[in-house]
Amino acid sequence: GDWVKSTMSLIGGAFGLVGSITYLYLIFIRSSRKGYQKSRTTKKPSSKLVRTFCGPVTAVVLTIAMLAGETVYLVYAMRATRAEATASSQYISVSAHRGGARKAPENTMSAIKYAVDSMSDYAEIDVQETSDGEIVLMHDTNLKRTTGLNASIWTLTYDEISQLDAGVRFNKKFRGEQIPKLEEVIAYAKGKINLNIEVKYNGHNQNIVKKVVKIIEDNDFVDQCVLTSMNYNFLRQAKKINPDIKTGYTMKMSYGGLEDMDAADFFSVKYTYITESFVEHAHSLGKEVCAWTLNYQGDMQRMVNCGVDNIITDDPELVRKV
């Protein structure tokens, strides 16, 4: 694999470095002897320029330059080898963001089906509560962006929401796509794909965690999902109801104090704030790191090198190419 090639390059660089040091040493020894012999039989060059650029001084300068270059190469080779060895030994799971929002209307059944077809490990979805207590898939608190209706989700019943078109604004071929209930999505996903269920806090859904956990338990789906939220108190509630539910704390930044976050089994962090040291610290606490939301190969490769455990993306097929 690539990491084997990097290791061979690393070994070659090490031999080159040793060789350069040896060569530099021999140059000094040889120059010292010749200088001593010539000083007894010949005159020194009258020009300082000639003395500087003729003979051993030039060789020494060139050797030092080569030595510096090989040292830099060796450092970079060591870092690349470590990163590639880590990447080759660790499986990184893939989550389709909102089901795969680049290929289908977000948080719809079509998006979940795409996540399955793209062989994603997880479909990441967002859930909120309607005015009559139904748990549905929706990211925004306002329905305008995805359905065209300028209304807050907590002001409408499920019957009213079910009449809205959640697909046509994405593409006409998805005309008639409905906003699904969490139960519908779980029923379809069972045995096909895991779900990352992000519980949104909007100030109007204080009992949403209890309802979401009940739906998960009633459908025997605990082992096939994780529950995440930016509201840490929601994670506490979930763990209190059912300690077996795997929970993740969604963060826009990589905060400190990870040791105190007992209600979180893993951390879901915006990729721009993830560093290798953060991942190592989380892993030392026995907690995984999920990176969101990546849609470019360069960013994905950096996260692979950092050692993250899961990548959330709108384009899961692209991640497999990294």
Model features per residue range: what roles?
Residues A104-Y114, P180-V185, V209, T250-D260, ...:
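Short, acidic/polar
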Residues H139-K246, A264, V269, H283-L285:
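Metal-dependent phosphodiesterase/phospholipase catalytic core, i.e.
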Residues I27-S47:
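Cytoplasmic membrane-interface regions of multi-pass membrane proteins
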Residues L74-E124, Q128-S131:
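Membrane-interface segments at or immediately adjacent to transmembrane helices
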Residues T41-R79:
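Internal/C-terminal transmembrane anchor helices
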